[in-house]
């Protein structure tokens, strides 16, 4: 069973027979139906069908029709389609070795490192034959199976302005450093040293979550899994139309990047409210709008 099925309201599926019933609904009553033809000599028809069990949240199945017209299920996954685009990003796409799926990667200067995500719309990528490495609109989202609500850090208006200015300066320095600017590289080194010194000093008397407001850290052996700490900007309740299970969707500000995540209410500790923070593990997903390259 897919471990994130519970996020979209299927925590009680315990057997393959129960799962097949749900996947059968996706196959016969899809909300979205896409297809493409494989690039190899067989030219098999690749099918991608999705069924929403709540708004923008559900299950996608992917497979192929053979020469005799029989459908072979290759892969399925739960999803949450985000509502907030992260803007144009230079995205590279890679086929996964372990399954018939694709992974996306982009560099975001707000993090200073690469972000890796599971590609939701693989059939769009196959049919578009788009080359990797181009700037295209990207919308990120995440599914979580464990999370807690934390209180916010008390911030004055002056502190918010100063933090925004520091963040803008940091992005500018990272951009310059990528282009080989030695002064920017030295400035970033000094900033890292100052940050380390500040944390070392404050951690003696304060909790780490009073010092660190948001974070985005790779988690576990899967490259698209992260431990995140983000500020809640919107809360949306969901109810699975088939099972009645309740989930919560939240818009998070994480290191200056806004994206939506969802979690089953049974897996969430605390009451989510705007201004509070969410901490948990997420499986990061992304939808790329292929063919809409930045001019």
Where are these regions (language model features)?
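Short coil-to-beta-strand transition motifs
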Residues: 219-231
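OB-fold and OB-like beta-barrel modules that bind single-stranded nucleic acids
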Residues: 230-232, 275, 282
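Long, hydrophobic alpha/beta structural blocks
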Residues: 38-220
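Short, Lys/Arg- and Gly-enriched loop/turn segments at beta-strand edges
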Residues: 283-295
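Short nucleic-acid-contacting surface segments enriched for D/E, G, S/T with interspersed K/R
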Residues: 264-280
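Short coil/turn segments at secondary-structure boundaries
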Residues: 243-245, 263-266, 293-294
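N-terminal alpha-helical "arm" segments
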Residues: 1-43
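OB-fold (S1/OB) nucleic-acid-binding surfaces
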Residues: 231-261
């Amino acid at each position: 069973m897919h471990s994130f099925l519970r996020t979209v309201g299927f925590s009680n599926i315990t057997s393959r027979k129960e799962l097949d019933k749900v996947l059968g609904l996706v196959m016969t009553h899809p909300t979205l139906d896409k297809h493409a033809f494989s690039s190899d000599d067989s030219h098999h028809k690749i099918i991608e069908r999705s069924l929403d069990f709540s708004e923008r949240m559900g299950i996608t199945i992917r497979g192929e029709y053979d020469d005799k017209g029989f459908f072979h299920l290759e892969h399925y996954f739960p999803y949450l389609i985000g509502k907030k685009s992260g803007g144009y990003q230079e995205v590279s796409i890679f086929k996964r070795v372990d399954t018939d799926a694709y992974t996306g990667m982009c560099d975001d200067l707000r993090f200073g490192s690469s972000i890796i995500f599971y590609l939701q719309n693989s059939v769009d990528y196959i049919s578009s034959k788009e080359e990797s490495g181009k700037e295209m609109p990207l919308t990120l989202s995440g599914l979580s199976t464990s999370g807690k609500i934390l209180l916010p850090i008390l911030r004055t208006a002056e502190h918010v302005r100063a933090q925004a200015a520091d963040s803008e300066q940091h992005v500018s320095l990272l951009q310059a450093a990528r282009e080989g600017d030695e002064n920017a590289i030295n400035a970033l080194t000094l900033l890292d040293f100052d940050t380390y010194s500040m944390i070392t000093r404050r951690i003696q008397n304060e909790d780490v979550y009073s010092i660190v407001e948001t974070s985005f850290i790779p988690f576990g052996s899967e490259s698209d899994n992260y431990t995140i700490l983000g500020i809640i900007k919107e809360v949306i309740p969901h109810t699975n139309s088939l099972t009645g299970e309740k989930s919560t969707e939240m818009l998070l500000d994480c290191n200056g990047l806004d994206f939506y995540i969802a979690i089953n209410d049974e897996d969430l500790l605390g009451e989510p409210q705007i201004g509070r923070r969410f901490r948990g593990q997420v499986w990061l997903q992304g939808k790329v709008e292929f063919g809409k390259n930045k001019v």
